[in-house]
Regions:
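Alpha/beta-hydrolase superfamily serine-hydrolase fold, recognizing
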Residues: 3-210
Length: 210
């Protein structure tokens, strides 16, 4: 099994769609060099964490999606629109006991209060906020996606957009499995050795891409 890590360009030096274009180009390169690497060009998987999760989904939505048998967003940042503009986002949709609520709100606000800043840093044009290649949640054509494994963290700001995207996939009869790690926050995938959930997440991904 061959693994490749994509060193895509980063904003603000290289705003949207630079990172997306880089990821697509790598998929195309792997397909065109499949014989050299002894891989099946129609049996590729793509995964990413946070912004990388959104890029993975965007690739699945694009013309290279036909080569991707599995797309794995790990708490993907699937919507870069400002929270104040979102009718689906609400603190009350996070189930938490009252004495812990202030801690959860503090964690959620790390991204909720940054969304306008993220738009300014990531996008060339604010009108791209709902471009499906920047915010996959707003995609209307899901036909290039064949299978999705969605990893969620219970107290992640982006969880609600992930939940909504999963519903869109199910409504379109696209296979989508959601694994939500209870009690976890955005970034838990980096805590191998500290969180058992991280180890379980890695094993689940390995099981799905075999």
């Amino acid at each position: 099994m061959l693994f490749r890590s994509i060193d895509y360009r980063l904003a603000p030096e290289a705003p949207f769609p630079a990172a997306f274009d880089d990821c697509k180009d790598v998929v195309k390169w792997l397909v065109h060099h499949a014989d050299h690497w002894n891989i099946d060009p129609n049996n590729l998987s793509i995964a990413g964490e946070s912004a990388g999760g959104a890029l993975a989904v965007s690739c699945g939505l694009s013309e290279v999606g036909k080569y991707l048998k599995l797309v794995i967003p790990i708490y993907g940042a699937l919507d870069v629109c400002s929270a104040s503009d979102l009718d689906y986002w609400d603190y009350d949709l996070y189930d938490v006991i009252p004495e812990h609520k202030k801690y959860v709100i503090t964690r959620l606000n790390r991204f909720r209060n940054l969304n306008g800043t993220l738009q300014n840093l990531y996008l060339n044009d604010i009108s791209d906020a709902k471009n499906p290649m920047a915010s996959p949640l707003y995609a209307t054509d899901l036909s290039n996606l064949s299978n999705v494994l969605m990893i969620e963290a219970e107290y992640d700001y982006f969880r609600l957009s992930n939940d909504l995207f999963a519903e869109h996939l199910w409504n379109a009869d696209i296979p989508c499995e959601v694994i939500r790690y209870q009690g976890m926050d955005h970034g838990f995938y980096d805590r191998l050795g500290y969180c058992e959930q991280t180890k379980d997440c890695i094993l689940e991904i390995a099981k799905h891409i075999k």
